[in-house]
Amino acid sequence: MALDGERGEQEEEKKKKKKKKKRKKKEEEGAEKSSSPFAATMGEDDAALRASGRGLSDPWADSVGVRPRTTERHIAVHKRLVLAFAVSIVALLAVTMLAVLLSLRFDECGASAAMPGTDGGLGGFPERDSNSSFPGSARRNHHAGGESSQRESGEVGTPGTPSAQPPSEEEREQWQPWTQLRLSGHLKPLHYNLMLTAFMENFTFSGEVNVEIACRNATRYVVLHASRVAVEKVQVAEDRAFGAVPVAGFFLYPQTQVLVVVLNRTLDAQRHYNLKIIYNALIENELLGFFRSSYVIHGERRFLGVTQFSPTHARKAFPCFDEPIYKATFKISIKHQATYLSLSNMPVETSVFEEDGWVTDHFSQTPLMSTYYLAWAICNFTYRETTTKSGVVVRLYARPDAIRRGSGDYALHITKRLIEFYEDYFKVPYSLPKLDLLAVPKHPYAAMENWGLSIFVEQRILLDPSVSSISYLLDVTMVIVHEICHQWFGDLVTPVWWEDVWLKEGFAHYFEFVGTDYLYPAWNMEKQRFLTDVLHEVMLLDGLASSHPVSQEVLRATDIDRVFDWIAYKKGAALIRMLANFMGHSVFQRGLQDYLTIHKYGNAARNDLWNTLSEALRRNGKYVNIQEVMDQWTLQMGYPVITILGNTTAENRILITQQHFIYDIGAKTKALQLQNSSYLWQIPLTIVVGNRSHVSSEAIIWVSNKSEHHRIAYLDRGSWILGNINQTGYFRVNYDLRNWRLLIDQLIRNHEVLSVSNRAALIDDAFSLARAGYLPQNIPLEIIRYLSEEKDFLPWHAASRALYPLDKLLDRMENYNIFNEYILKQVATTYIKLGWPRNNFNGSLVQASYQHEELRREVIMLACSFGNKHCHQQASTLISDWISSNRNRIPLNVRDIVYCTGVSLLDEDVWEFIWMKFHSTTAVSEKKILLEALTCSDDRNLLSRLLNLSLNSEVVLDQDAIDVIIHVARNPHGRDLAWKFFRDKWKILNTRYGEALFMNSKLISGVTEFLNTEGELKELKNFMKSYDGVASASFSRAVETVEANVRWKRFYQDELFQWLGKAMRH
């Protein structure tokens, strides 16, 4: 038995060796076959067939028996087949060689199908459905076989033997430059001649653009941006001596929104060429590109066409090099019906009238400029006009009825003064001969700073003194100040790329406050209102683990829209303010003057700014490396919290530490970008020491380490320490509990020892530190006990803004009344002292008592919001009087408060009355507050009705619908309704607002920021998963915010209510 067993094993071993030899032979034969490109292709095709279900799956293939064919007849047949196969291979090789010699590429064959007059010629208008193909895009060439499917997917074949390795990114960019986010830089536009004909009766337009281009590097492709345009004809020519450059074809590549022109020969470097494109497109009903809007006058609906090109939408109106670095001059001509007028960046040079009722306006040539602030409009508006000291003509265009009422006079007046202010401050004259301000009914943003033609939504520029409050006047003023600043920061000097968009938006936002201080010095905006309206607001957002640096890489097309958020605007402004304060304002101003002078009509990056400012400091005898300091603030996300531990030794030394401030500490451990990182900032910490009657002079300490010891003069056991004086720095300050107690005692005994700004800063820091768990919950509530003695607006405003999110966290709790009563107790004394305003404005909004009136408004709003009985009674009486007499005697500065309170307290008839007034009024400021008042109702049926009406553009303007949804979400009776409506209508909302910069993020944040239960958090996460990748950054912030809300309630709400219970019993 044993021998038999050994023999069996030997026979088995022989069988295994035979099988191994056969397998090796087959593998060698297979390798020979696979070395042939044709065989490789066949193998790939076979795999593709199996993957698509048309080939046999593996189980089915295993069940098919192989039948031998060994007769001579079959062998002869096989020989003939092999011979035929060999002949076909030779023929294929010959054709391939011929194609190589003629430089024919498969992508050109596909492109030729898109040429006019050939198969696949262009015509008609672009489809509005983003999923459908664009006219003029790459179409299937039926004579090119399988290559067309490659072209449509962006994989364009090249002649030659297939490479075993995939192409590198550099190689891919060379032969597929249209697949890249950025244009290649081979071509540079020098000048555009753009001729448009607008057909307002059917909302279409035709265009012809001639672009003079300089060729930097030899190329056979002309790649420029184009989207939603139907290209009819493309021509390329050199100068007169050389003539036309043959065009092999052209196609649109929607993935990167470019038009690709394929040439039959290479463009030579260092030569100039002319590119001519004839196209047509729609005047869209959306809010981007060249779009239409309308208004009703005397019962007649009238239309207008207007543009919004920032950041990447000029390509929707004409083919162009649509990146900020590609500056060129523009000569625009617009043909339209004579019943309209046209506007653009420059004045009209000549107008040619035709017998058929059409006119062509030819505009003067622009200076060098980027495409995103090119603009034009076609409307039948009228205007008012003024002229600056330097001769700049300023006009305001608006609806004829608004011009007749004088609604644009205020904006016109301050624009003239602001141009003169900026010319003096920057020492750089305004660069164009005119500046037009255009007020339109519908626009995606408050305003757009197009050079020489700034476009505003009506609510942010038209002001009727008879119905506008001081708050509304302030809003209008600051928007105008912002946009006029852009004529220098953004238009004259433009960021190189969108990663540094804060270089224009941050400066414009900062100068909102500097410019308003020039107009109204008593308002003291930069030192006071900047804190609550910019610094405190953006630090809430930047305290999230999902935040991002103010300068962030833009790697994908979708990233461009994402950089336009409050981090770029408000954090950019806050960092600029910090920089101005530690440099000194006069040195900072001289640095800005040099920056604008050096880079005017060009582009600049952040390092250009840092170098210029460092040089300004050096000339003043100070040697600070601005780039080294500011890179930490612009290239790192978030901000630090400084903790000061006072008098730790007998030598008057304090310990100062810094760490990254995060609201939800749990989120910090989950955020990958924060793990194993050690954020450090160079922090200009200003500090004072004080007691009940005296405050030391200000000292500055540069903190650059995690922890540092410093000696402080005048420090004793009874003295307190205060850091970040007047909150000029972009960071929070925490103290040991003993120092907090000393500061609270100082506020209660004599709050005026601390400046107004310092009092507001203490309130905001305390609430934020408690919210994040750095402080006990009672500290901020103890601080606001002194408010009964506070006579200044800013600390009240800081307290109101800090209490608002806390109120929304608690407003659905059973013991909410304890918190409500505590706040009413702090408000009651000041409410009684100030009383209600009288309606005696006599047409003048700008009063010396601005601060007093804003304080009164803030206290009345708190009193009515938290249920003060007298406040409720007063609001109800004013509303009832208006309804019964049909005369509105409600004081202007509290109308929004009264409207909201009345709708909340009274019956459905009041809601219907406000709804009627919303439809009948023509004053844009009144219309806005009436619409918002409708969201205050306690009636859920009315709130649901309003939400549904908000999506009807004939009833509620597109830009106002977002505000309706957000305000319903802020109402505790409507929060769940708005959240459900948002989810149900998300596809509609995303389609409408998805491309409009941060409108989508505003909506997502506004609807979700006060969700605070485990169930709501789960709903949000599930909803986010179902739309994976859509608005992902905004949804990530929303999830983190709701997680922080849930976490705070879990860990801190009991602590808060326990302290409130004790406080209310004493």
Swiss-Prot record:
Its EC number is 3.4.19.6. Substrate binds at residues 446-450. Glycans are attached at residues 131, 202, 217, 264, 380, 647, 676, 691, 705, 726, 842, 948. Its cofactor is Zn(2+). It is a single-pass type II membrane protein. InterPro entries: Aminopeptidase_N-like_N (IPR045357), Aminopeptidase_N-like_N_sf (IPR042097), ERAP1-like_C_dom (IPR024571), M1_APN-typ (IPR034016), Peptidase_M1 (IPR001930), Peptidase_M1_aminopeptidases (IPR050344), Peptidase_M1_dom (IPR014782), Peptidase_M4/M1_CTD_sf (IPR027268). Residues 15-25 have a biased composition (Basic residues). The record marks 569 as: Transition state stabilizer. The chain crosses the membrane at residues 82-102. Zn(2+) binds at residues 482, 486, 505. The modification Phosphothreonine is found at residue 71. One of its GO terms (biological process) is proteolysis. Residues 103-1066 are extracellular. It catalyses: Release of the N-terminal pyroglutamyl group from pGlu-|-His-Xaa tripeptides and pGlu-|-His-Xaa-Gly tetrapeptides. Gene3D superfamilies: 1.25.50.20, 2.60.40.1910, Neutral Protease Domain 2 (1.10.390.10), tricorn interacting facor f3 domain (2.60.40.1730). Residues 1-81 are cytoplasmic. The keyword Protease applies. Pfam families: ERAP1_C (PF11838), Peptidase_M1 (PF01433), Peptidase_M1_N (PF17900). It is found in: Membrane. GO terms for molecular function: aminopeptidase activity; metallopeptidase activity; pyroglutamyl-peptidase activity; zinc ion binding. The keyword Lyase does not apply. GO terms for cellular component: membrane. It is an enzyme of class 3 (hydrolase). Belongs to the peptidase M1 family. This is Thyrotropin-releasing hormone-degrading ectoenzyme. It comes from Mus musculus (Mouse).
